[in-house]
Amino acid sequence: MIAGLLLSILLFSQAAPLETVVASLNNRAITYSEILQEGELLNIENNVPPETPLSPELKEKILRLIFFRIILSEEAREQEITVDEQLVRKSAENYMKNVYMKAFIKKYELTDFEFKTIIKMRLITDKMTTNFIEQKFPNGNKHSKEDEKKVIEDWENNLLKRQKVIIYSMP
């Protein structure tokens, strides 16, 4: 009887894993489940099954991407840069056409508001990045995708230098 009780406690304690904080950006904790959620959503966006395992290198890139999105969302708010709600709604509808999306939303128990907030952050990041590229290469100056990638990478690094970033080990 006691063995059964201990087994029950062990099983139930395994059902709800603790959140592991993998980083902090300006005192905002970033959890491992956020890395996994973002990774699954990136897989879905690229028409890859969401449960496809994430390599350690990809997890690091995802963490940087999360940092970048948070920073740009804050900068957009400060600069009063927004995206049209109709665009957010239309993008949400497009995401919902993906065969994996309903299961993703159910798995992470996302409300409609939370789902649209995720999409809105992506759209704001895209808009801020487009604005930055247009400033760096004005009047349609010719440039390669590599030039663009390098400029964005430098921008990300400079933005990160101005933040309080702590990175812990990732499972």
Predicted segments with their positions:
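Residue-level marker of intrinsically disordered, low-complexity segments enriched
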Residues: 7, 19-20, 163-165
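Intrinsically disordered, low-complexity regions
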Residues: 4-5, 40, 141
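Hydrophobic membrane-targeting alpha-helices
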Residues: 8-11, 75, 131
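Cell-wall glycan
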Residues: 121-123
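A C-terminal, polar beta->alpha supersecondary segment
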Residues: 106, 125-171
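Sec-dependent N-terminal signal peptides
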Residues: 1-13
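N-terminal targeting/tethering segments
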Residues: 14-119
